[in-house]
C-alpha cells in the first residue's frame, strides 16, 4: 500500500508540474495578444539573450533541404533590403538534416571561404529544384567544383576551429529556441513565427514595432548566426 501511495503522489506531482507549465504558457500567450502582438507569434519561454548593440535581432532558422525555406528566401531578401538601420537579420542553420543535408557545416564553411552570399540561393535551388544530393559528400564536392570552389580547401576549412565553433553555437541556439521545423523566425529573443505564409512579413513588421515600443532587450550574448545583407537607411 505504501508503495502504491508513493507512486500516486509522484504521478500527481508530475501532473501538477505539467498543468503549471501549460498554464504559464497560456498566460504568456494571452498577455501577448492583449498587447497587440500577432496571434501567430508565440512568446519564447524563457526569452533568449540577444546582442547588446541597440539593434533588434531577427533570426531566421532554415534548412537547405526545406522547400518552404527555398521559396521564402527571395521574399525574405527583399524584406531585409528595405529594413531600417535599427534591425539586423541573421541566418541560423537548423540542427536536423532535411533531404539528408546538414546545413550548418555547408553554411559556415562557405561563409568562412567568403563565397556564401554567392551560393546561398544556389544551394536552395540545387537541393529543392534540381534534386542534387548535397548530403552525399562526393556529389557535394562535384557541385562545389562547378561553382568554382576547391573541394579540398572546402574540406580543410570545414575542419577549422572557427567553423566548428560556429557550428556548435548554432546547434546550441537551435536547442535554446526549441527549433523543430523550418522556416522559423525569432524576433529579439522574445517571439517566434513559423512558416512562410503571406502574413509573415506583416506579422514581422508588427513585432518590430512592438519591440521598439517596449524596448526590453534580454541580455548580452555571442550569437552563432550570420547576418544577412541589408541596405541601411
Task: Go through the PLM ranges and name each one.
Residues 65, 76, 80-83, 110-114, ...:
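Sec/Tat-exported extracytoplasmic proteins
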Residues 64-68, 95-99, 125-130, 160-163, ...:
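Solvent-exposed loop/turn segments at secondary-structure junctions
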Residues 2-5, 63, 146-233:
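C-terminal cap of thioredoxin/glutaredoxin-like
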Amino acid at each position: 500500500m505504501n508503495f502504491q501511495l508513493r507512486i500516486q503522489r509522484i504521478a500527481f506531482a508530475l501532473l501538477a508540474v505539467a498543468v503549471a507549465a501549460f498554464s504559464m504558457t497560456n498566460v504568456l500567450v494571452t498577455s501577448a495578444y492583449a498587447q497587440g502582438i500577432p496571434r501567430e507569434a508565440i512568446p519564447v519561454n524563457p526569452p533568449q539573450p540577444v546582442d547588446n548593440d541597440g539593434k533588434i535581432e531577427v533570426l531566421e532558422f532554415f534548412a537547405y533541404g526545406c522547400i518552404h525555406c527555398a521559396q521564402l528566401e527571395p521574399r525574405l531578401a527583399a524584406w531585409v533590403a528595405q529594413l531600417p538601420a535599427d534591425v539586423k537579420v541573421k541566418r541560423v542553420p537548423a540542427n536536423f538534416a532535411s533531404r539528408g543535408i546538414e546545413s550548418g557545416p555547408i553554411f559556415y564553411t562557405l561563409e568562412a571561404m567568403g563565397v556564401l552570399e554567392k551560393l546561398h540561393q544556389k544551394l536552395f535551388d540545387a537541393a529543392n529544384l534540381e534534386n542534387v544530393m548535397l548530403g552525399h559528400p562526393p556529389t557535394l564536392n562535384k557541385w562545389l567544383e562547378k561553382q568554382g570552389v576547391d573541394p579540398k580547401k572546402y574540406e580543410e576549412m570545414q575542419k577549422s576551429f572557427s567553423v566548428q565553433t560556429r557550428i556548435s553555437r548554432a546547434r546550441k541556439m537551435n536547442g535554446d529556441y526549441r527549433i523543430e521545423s523550418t522556416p522559423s523566425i525569432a524576433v529579439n529573443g522574445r517571439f517566434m513565427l513559423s512558416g512562410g505564409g503571406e502574413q509573415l512579413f506583416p506579422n514581422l513588421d508588427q513585432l518590430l514595432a512592438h519591440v521598439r515600443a517596449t524596448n526590453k532587450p534580454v541580455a548580452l550574448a555571442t550569437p552563432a548566426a550570420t547576418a544577412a545583407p541589408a541596405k541601411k537607411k
